[in-house]
Amino acid sequence: MALAPAAGQRRQDMAQDSEIARGDGTARSARTFTGAGQRGTRPGRLWGWIESRTGIRALAYAVPEHANTIWYILGGITFMAILISVASGVWIAQYYNPDPAAARESVLFIQNEALLGDVMRGIHIWSAYIAVIGAVLHMVRVFITASYKAPREVNWLVGVGLLGLIMFGAFFTGTVLRWDQEAYEAMVHNMELASLLGAFGGFFSDAFTTSVSMLPRLYIAHVSIVPLLLVFLLIAHIFLIKYHGISPTPAQEEAGEAPGGKLPKERQTASYATHARKMLGYGLVVLGLAGTLAVLLPGAIGAAPDPAMEITKPSPIYYWMYTPEAWFGVNGVLYAAIVFFGLLVLVPFLDRTPLRRLRRRPLMLGLGGVLVVALTVLTIITAVTPVVSHLE
Ligand code: HEM
């Protein structure tokens, strides 16, 4: 008996909190989010119970209107693609064997015999592509709206780390696990690059230990080290987004409406609940898209690796590095990565004016343009040229 009024009071307090957070006192979206409109009905009572026990209403905090447009949900869509990739990865890991003598056979087992193996493997591969493409599009949005400017420079750097991690940690190690010809060549590249890095590359080289071969070590990286780092960086990214709030639009900032790079409370008239709902909706679209692609374009499994040959190109995601490799040898991969990621790291420190519209930031307009043209041209050259032998 004594607990009931306390829970009711807590609910009332939380409702007031979300009204205060909205600044305009209407709490319209908070009510929609919590389903309070249907109080008295069975689903309404169930939802009320969930709210009071979990505090989910706290998600209905105020955000600027533009935060709920697709451009500002691209990061959330990338997040959903990562979640789908993790869930499908857990499924196929039940059937994968990282022993080099059995790895490729186990991938064939996943594709042809395991329960839902082909669909889950396809969803895993395609959601990984969607995550990389989503992260790049999200970064382009942040770049165009100059959201990396003070006070969000550190979050831009965390983002660069996330991009590197999903492209070279998750995606790359995943490619090697297939243990066909392309996978094997990717791993040999990994080892040659490690030797170029000297002491820094030790961990990624074959010589690090004689007790476990490279494939099981890359598997451990793929299923534990990389996901742990990803969780750590995502927590930092999300903390900083919450701490600084979503950046104002370039027009709002240049009109002086956002002192300190943040819209005042009374201008934040939308709800994060809407953002979260849209994110879940787009997440279902990503799942549907990955599932459809899994059926229409199942992930290929090449011939068993032959160490004497070099016959494949990497995944299209790395095409921009393959052409520099043809020009400079394996060093070319390193040069391409250093130039690309080095420029990304420099962005917030090169562009320090308060101007936010892209057309008023000629240096960034030029840098962005040069990068897009260079990446496109390098990718096209790789696509139209025959395979070249790069390895010693
Ligand atoms: C794994 C990849 C990533 C995930 C899951 C992710 C997630 C998010 C989410 C959910 C937001 C909130 C708003 C939005 O969606 O735009 C955001 C904001 C932000 N992200 Fe990312 N992000 C990723 C990669 C990146 C990259 C590659 C960069 C840049 C190099 C970056 C820089 C930023 C910045 C500066 C903000 C604040 C933007 C603002 O306040 O307008 N993120 N991110």
Language model features with spans:
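Membrane-embedded alpha-helical bundles that constitute the cytochrome b-like, heme-associated redox core
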Residues: 2-327, 332-392
